[in-house]
Amino acid sequence: MRTLLEKLNYKGQQRIAVINAEKNFRLAPVREIKKIQIDKEIDPRYPYDFMIVFAKDSSEVDEFTPSALHNLKVDGILWFCYPKKSSEKASPGLDRDHGWKALNDLDFFGIRLVNVDENWSALRFRNIKFIKSASDRFKPGKEL
């Protein structure tokens, strides 16, 4: 069975950011992450290749988007985790297709969905200029 890190396209980056995660969140078994520096806050001086941001609602998406994009390397891997509809933490304005205006307005669109656990899903965002199969759904004014 693939680990969450494998599902999230982790490629051996030495330093990553995992922002706003719940205290009980486990990214991977300890043996798998012991050589990775995991920042729980974005270091404004560090450009990240791999970043995971947890958002309980669209206001948290709005809050974390500017610093996440500012510190994401060109075509870095950016995941936003959000509560599943079946979770008690679910927000009516945040799901796979809604609540991502802050990212969409900056030309970042959801390209891949991954199951994190029973309460969370993760949506990978990528800048439109790196999306090979850009279709009409990525045109300006279309919120995902």
Positions of the model-derived regions?
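Short acidic low-complexity segments
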Residues: 37-48
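Flexible, glycine-/basic-rich loop-and-beta segments that form/coincide
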Residues: 4, 129-144
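Conserved beta strand-loop-helix elements of the APE1-like EEP
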Residues: 122-130
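Conserved Class I S-adenosyl-L-methionine
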Residues: 93-112
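Mid-chain, well-packed structural core segment of small domains
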Residues: 62-96
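Short, charged/polar "capping" segments at the starts of alpha-helices
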Residues: 23-29, 88-90
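Short, glycine-rich nucleotide/cofactor-binding loops
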Residues: 51-61
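Conserved class I S-adenosyl-L-methionine
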Residues: 8-21
